[in-house]
Amino acid sequence: ANGIRVMAGFIIGFDGEKDGAGLRIVDFVTRTGIPAAMMGMLQALPQTALWHRLEKEGRLIQDESAAKGVNQTNLLNFKPTRPIRDIANEYVEAFCTLYEPNAYMDRVYSYYLKMGAPRWKGTSKLPTWTDVKALSIVIWRQGLKRDTRGRFWRYLFGMARQNPAMLEQFIVVLAHNEHF
């Protein structure tokens, strides 16, 4: 785990997918301690094998021009094999569970405690104004404003004591959660 930051992406909405896919994703991410787990709903991209199969089956609900670019204007762009409401509910529930502040902090803390110190040492430099602003935002939101502030400070000081070489990265990854 030295120098590698694990990230994982999960897609929900496949044909043949059984109920509970979202919970299985949450369970996997929790058991493995992956700090950054991205979730998405399946989209059929134009001119792919999936697109052609769904087109042949009459299941596409979006034409090719609408399917280009950002695929975040609808849940799925095809008719799934199980109810779309179930898929959407599982997606939202899984996402909210993964990024619930306590669960997210627990995963990030556990992960960075296990990380070894980087072998390559960069040259030390003073933080930029952007770095100072970002740190201030994290401290304000996570260390003062939220009800998770006790956990934040416990984990921050724990990381500083037990794995100081990873403290900066720990804070950076905690900050990533600020856009959710």
Each model region followed by its residue ranges:
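A structural motif corresponding to the C-terminal lobe/cap of the Radical SAM core domain
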Residues: A1-L135, Q142-G143
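Terminal or standalone catalytic/regulatory effector modules within metabolic enzymes
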Residues: V132-F180
